[in-house]
Amino acid sequence: MSQTQATLDDRTLRGAGFMLLGATLIQWSAAIVERVFPVIGPSASSAWRFLLGAVVLLALTRPNVRHWTKRQWIGALALGATVAVMNQCFYQAIARIPLGSAVAIEYLGPFCVAAFGKRSPKHLAFVGLAGAGVVALTRPGNGLNVIGVLFAFGAGLGWATYIFASKRVGGTTKGFGGLAVSMSIAATLTLPFSIGTSARLVESPELLLRLLIVAVMAIVLGFGAELQGLRRLKPSIAGVLLAGDPAVAFLVGWLLLHQAVRLWDIVGLACVVLAGVGVTYDSSVSESELAQ
């Protein structure tokens, strides 16, 4: 193995490690924040997560934005708006349906972007497999809240956009300055949801501490790790790793929230994950053949 190949392999392994770490921290933080929902609700919880996370990131990075280009600002604005909508929808979803089911449905967003990018018969088969997975997860009698499912689909649309926006911010800014600005924009957009709950946080330091932990885990460490992973990985490899997010969510929901995992849930999860891995792998093979 040449030195260049070894460097690339090391870079890929580090990127994969960052992606797995980011997914675990984000889903773990979702399990923690669910216990705050009965007190201040999912919308306010999301808003405080962005506000506290942005404050921590700004304090740590102190981004110098005076010399930012228009392209950098557009990227940060796009990422901030995207994660604001995505997380609001996601928190509304997990307040109504199990964490694993919500993430599996949400994953259809980036999956469809990859699948419909190339309309080959194989890709259509993978779309059918993913569709079967969603039917298994949301089948009549499964007890899933319809509004929660719709919010999960909304979060999926946000996730699809997030992939492009985060890649752009990671490619046009250095360090975590771009992430800090993006999260500040998200905090500003969701600020109205947090205003009415300020008194409760003042009265309950424990609640404020829990939200701070969630903010650090999800935004500072989770999003930060994903950003580092996306900087190091090819889109095809990143796509395969993202397909594992629903499995991580089901595991976290089962271990930390004691959410039941039924046979149909496992079948649905397997269909969605296999479809995601398949469509990503097929795309990467097609790109390699075209390059030769």
Give the residues covered by each predicted segment:
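C-terminal-most transmembrane helix of multi-pass membrane proteins
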Residues: S2-Q5, L207, A243-Q292
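Juxtamembrane helix-entry segments on the extracytoplasmic side of multipass membrane proteins
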Residues: R11-G15, V39-S43, A47, W68-W73, ...
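Specific alpha-helical transmembrane segments that line the substrate/conduction pathway
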Residues: A44-V55, V83, N87-R119, A155, ...
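Juxtamembrane helix-loop-helix junctions in multi-pass membrane proteins
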Residues: G22-G53, S101, T161-A186, S204
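Transmembrane alpha-helical segments that form core, pore/gating elements
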Residues: L57, V113-A114, A130-A132, G141-S198, ...
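Hydrophobic transmembrane alpha-helices of multi-pass small-molecule transport proteins
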Residues: L57, L108, K122-G141, V252, ...
